[in-house]
Design a protein with these regions (language model features):
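A glycine- and small-aliphatic-rich helix-loop capping segment at beta-alpha/alpha-beta transitions
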Residues: 11-16, 104-108
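ATP-binding/phosphotransfer module of carbohydrate and carboxylate kinases, centering on a glycine-rich
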Residues: 27-126
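A short acidic Gly-Thr/Ser loop motif
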Residues: 1-3, 24, 91-93
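Gly/Thr-rich phosphate-binding beta-strand-loop-beta motif of the actin/hexokinase/Hsp70
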Residues: 1-15, 31, 117
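Active-site-proximal catalytic alpha-helix in oxidoreductases
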Residues: 5, 19-20, 65-66
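Short, acidic/small-residue loops that bind anionic groups at enzyme active sites
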Residues: 15-32
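C-terminal nuclease/phosphodiesterase catalytic domains that cleave nucleic-acid phosphodiester bonds
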Residues: 10, 22, 37-38
């Protein structure tokens, strides 16, 4: 998507803050639209870490780079929390590809956003 957002939700289920940075799709679009002659590519699993052609290099950079960035941020969050082990849930159209390459345990929940919206609806319908 256009943005990757990390939200910290406390054990009391309150939003405590977060981080936001360019998402996978925005990063791919930036490479193809703002650099000389790089193609638009699809986001799919790379054949190997080190690409052998332009498209494979772009794909590996995104598919391995985004999880490495997330792992680094998760490690820093863990340090900020005094070593507490956070639960990590990924959503969004690119999450299944990216979460697979994270070294931290990441649970993919395809319906988390819809479940949250439904919970808000139910709360307000009362």
């Amino acid at each position: 998507g256009p943005a990757t957002i990390i939200s910290y939700i406390s054990k009391k289920r309150t939003y405590e803050g977060g981080l936001m940075f360019p998402g996978v799709r925005l990063s791919l679009d930036a490479l193809s639209h703002h650099t000389a002659q790089l193609p638009n590519i699809s986001l799919e699993h790379p054949r190997q870490l080190i690409g052998k052609n332009t498209e494979d290099c772009m794909r590996s950079g995104i598919v391995y780079g985004a999880p490495a960035m997330l792992d680094g941020v998760i490690d820093r969050i863990r340090e900020t929390l005094g070593g507490a082990e956070p639960s990590i849930v990924a959503t969004g159209p690119n999450a299944p590809v990216i979460a697979r390459y994270c070294r931290n345990h990441v649970v993919y929940d395809k319906y988390l956003l819809m479940e949250g919206l439904y919970a808000i609806y139910q709360k307000n319908a009362k």
